[in-house]
Regions:
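PLP-dependent amino-acid enzyme catalytic core
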Residues: 1-487
């Protein structure tokens, strides 16, 4: 049996079902597994994606039946991903793109958020819980739509999504504002993503709110990557990338592969760390940041400073100054719940913390870092297209630029391509040297004409869909939204 405990309190021990149903520990810590399971990597590399997903996830979700996980993975990673689940595309030499945007909402979040609703429903069955689950989601763009798509019309669940007003692309906003379903709600929040995320976290940590909702038979949960159920499915595609390189004869078994990950909340790259700890021959995990380069500074100096200028960039899903999942890594490296609790207390009270030199050294054994300016992002999009014929979005461009700086001779580099370029058509079109129309749908059509590529049907169809949600609130209003729900 695999148990989980809080990064801030060892004594708070839960099962996988409890961790997924609850989302966040009561004192604000994140749930982490008690150990890293060791797996037969060679055997896993022989499996197709659904079977691989079931095998990896079952190592952690030990209170779920293996038959359930196998069926859940089979139904999740089939037609909805168009046969391209975990697709690895060659780009240049031994640099590859792991294209994670072939799912229903055209972003990597689909890998977790198409499976996670099934995990939540099963968790409630495992725990004999019958209450309504209220899911609160803070999003910088992609998580919101992926969560709405995964959870819409799931029985016994309500979901409310909060995004920073003006802090997403227009396509991302419309994906959320037009979402269908009787159990969904979307709110724009004045401020940036960190304001929205902090507001949601405060609701989770407010015992009075929890008590009032409990009186109505409602329990809070999260679909953000603070929830273990969001993180564990993302481990799978690191194994899938390695398996494809192995099958193509690009590596021999046991050879290291480096991964460069465009990073905001630190969940996607942390999944790579878990894969490495499970035995996958991951070399370097390169953390690629945009102009909001708080993680680059931390990984370089050991000091995390969230109180800094915030930039709205062309890669909005990474416009984040408080990277929640870093807390999990700090726990795994230090092994001390008291130390992590102290660091998070310092971050909350002063906006910064500094880790011990030996902690930073331990992190640097697995992680490297770099960042890209807006000019470098645009240049990378154009260079990849003109040189390699590869069309990428702004977030992948951040990572391609950093990957080129960190590439090791003879070691394959896999860049995680996290979103379709058609989610950010104006930025991509302008990077290619074209004048972009103000309207995103006209820009999408112009990008199709300029590149000969076809926009995903789900994005093009947004133009015909009616907007359902337009409410704008202050961060403090998130609590009022939560308290407005009835069983």
């Amino acid at each position: 049996m695999m148990n989980f405990f809080s990064t801030r309190d060892h004594d708070r021990i839960v099962t996988a079902s409890q961790a997924i149903a609850q989302g966040l520990s009561d004192e604000g810590g994140l749930f982490v597994p008690e150990r890293f399971p060791q797996v037969d990597v060679r055997a896993l590399c022989q499996l197709d994606y659904p079977a691989l997903a079931a095998a990896v996830v079952s190592e952690y979700l030990t209170d779920y039946s293996k038959d359930f996980l196998a069926e859940a993975a089979r139904t999740t990673y089939g037609e909805a991903f168009g046969g391209k689940a975990g697709y690895l595309a060659p780009v240049e030499g031994d640099t590859y793109a792991l294209e994670l945007w072939h799912g229903p909402t055209c972003a990597f979040k689909d890998y977790a958020l198409q499976l996670m609703p099934k995990l939540l429903v099963e968790a409630k069955k495992n725990l004999s819980r019958t209450e309504k689950t209220l899911i609160l989601v803070a999003t910088s763009g992609d998580t919101g739509k992926a969560a709405l798509d995964g959870y819409h019309d799931i029985p016994g669940v309500e979901i409310a999504v909060f995004y920073p007003t003006g802090g997403t692309s227009e396509i991302q906003r419309l994906q959320m504002a037009t979402q269908e379903g009787a159990n969904v709600a979307v709110y724009a929040v004045r401020g940036n993503f960190d304001d929205a995320q902090t507001g949601v976290k405060r609701v989770f940590g407010d015992k009075a709110i929890a008590a009032k909702l409990a009186e109505r038979n409602i329990r809070l949960s999260s679909a953000n990557s603070i929830n273990w159920g969001r993180l564990v499915p993302q481990i799978v595609y690191y194994f899938a990338a390695y398996a494809q390189l192995l099958k193509a004869g690009k590596i021999a078994f046991g050879d290291e592969v480096d991964f460069c990950v465009p990073t905001g909340n630190f969940g996607d790259i942390l999944a790579g760390y878990y894969a490495k700890q499970m035995g996958l021959p991951v070399g370097r995990l390169v953390c690629a940041s945009n102009q909001n380069n708080v993680l680059t500074d931390f990984l370089s100096t050991g000091t995390y400073t969230a109180k800094r200028e915030f930039y709205k960039t062309t890669s909005p899903s990474m416009d984040i100054l408080v990277s929640s999942n870093l807390e999990r890594l700090l726990y795994h490296v230090t092994g001390s719940d008291a130390e992590v609790a102290g660091l998070m207390k310092s971050l909350n009270e002063t906006g910064s913390y500094t880790v011990r030199p030996e902690t930073l050294a331990a992190i640097r054994e697995s992680f490297d870092c770099g960042w890209s300016s807006e000019e470098q992002v645009a240049g990378e999009i154009r260079a990849r297209y003109e040189k390699d014929g590869y069309l990428c979005d702004t977030h992948a461009a951040v990572a391609f630029h950093v990957a080129a700086q960190k590439k090791r001779d003879g070691v394959p580099m896999v860049v995680l391509s996290t979103a379709s370029p058609f989610k950010f058509p104006r930025s991509v079109l302008e990077a290619l040297g074209h004048t972009a129309p103000e309207n995103d749908f006209e820009a999408m059509r112009a990008l199709e004409e300029a590149t000969g590529r076809t926009a995903p049907a789900s994005l093009a169809a947004l133009r015909q869909k009616a907007e359902r949600f337009s409410t704008v609130i202050d961060p403090a209003g998130i609590a009022e939204v939560a308290l407005g729900y009835q069983a």
